[in-house]
């Protein structure tokens, strides 16, 4: 460990998030900056890594709407677009990213709801998981409470998203999801029901079909697929 940063401040939702709570930290695709998504104070803080001192330097802050609860950030493989999932407002915001200048630039170009329901601010719902398919053409998210998974088609030129479906996941309170390397299957971890559900994705019919029985696991929160190196 060469450096550590403590976020300070007071959030806007006293019942849930009233103090700094970093939920996701991810480098920009060009490895110039580190994005710290703070769910508690509705901010994404952007740090530069000083390679001479091995210290983090705050260079910018994405100040998100109050009571939106940013949770996860993902970047497209081409490094041009960033997608931020908002837990409390149940939205995905698309940003155009440019790291070529002295400071990073994030331009908001789209906001889309994680659920087609009208009341996106339903306090019983919480956007929870976000994953980009390996082909770069599809993005998936889960919404806990209503317990659904949504698939969006992604325009590779503009970065914009178009909803293709929102379907139930046959589990209670999904916390995360992951796309398999073949892009044909996805797994959802359900915290309350204590299961991992695997689905086959049919991109032509815009549906998912459960693949086998749910796997039992105690209160799962996250999931990741990591390749095993060949001997």
Pin down the residues of each PLM region.
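Asp-box/WD-like beta-propeller blade repeats and closely related beta-sheet repeat scaffolds
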Residues: 1-24
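Beta-propeller fold detector
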Residues: 1-9, 57-62, 104-114, 161-168, ...
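Beta-rich catalytic cores
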Residues: 21, 69, 126, 173, ...
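Short coil/turn segments that connect the beta-strands within blades of beta-propeller domains
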Residues: 30-32, 78-80, 135-137, 182-184
């Amino acid at each position: 460990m060469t450096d550590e940063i403590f976020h300070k401040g007071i959030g806007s939702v006293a019942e849930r998030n009233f103090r700094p709570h970093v939920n996701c930290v991810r480098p920009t695709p060009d490895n110039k900056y580190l994005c710290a998504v703070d769910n508690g104070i509705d901010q994404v803080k952007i740090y530069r890594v000083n390679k001479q001192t091995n210290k983090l330097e705050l260079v910018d802050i994405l100040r998100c709407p109050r009571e939106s609860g940013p949770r996860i950030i993902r970047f497209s493989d081409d490094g041009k677009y960033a997608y931020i999932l908002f837990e409390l407002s149940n939205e995905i915001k698309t940003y155009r990213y440019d790291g070529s200048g002295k400071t990073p630039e994030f331009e908001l170009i789209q906001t889309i709801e994680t659920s087609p329901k009208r009341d996106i601010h339903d306090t019983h719902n919480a956007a929870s998981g976000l994953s980009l398919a390996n082909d770069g053409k599809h993005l998936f998210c889960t919404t806990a409470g209503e317990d659904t998974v949504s698939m969006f088609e992604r325009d590779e030129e503009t970065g914009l998203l178009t909803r293709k479906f929102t379907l139930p996941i046959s589990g209670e309170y999904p916390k995360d999801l992951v796309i398999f390397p073949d892009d044909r299957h996805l797994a959802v971890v359900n915290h309350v029901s204590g299961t991992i559900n695997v689905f086959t994705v049919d991109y032509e019919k815009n549906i998912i079909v459960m693949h086998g029985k749910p796997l039992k696991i105690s209160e799962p929160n996250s999931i990741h697929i990591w390749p095993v190196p060949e001997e």
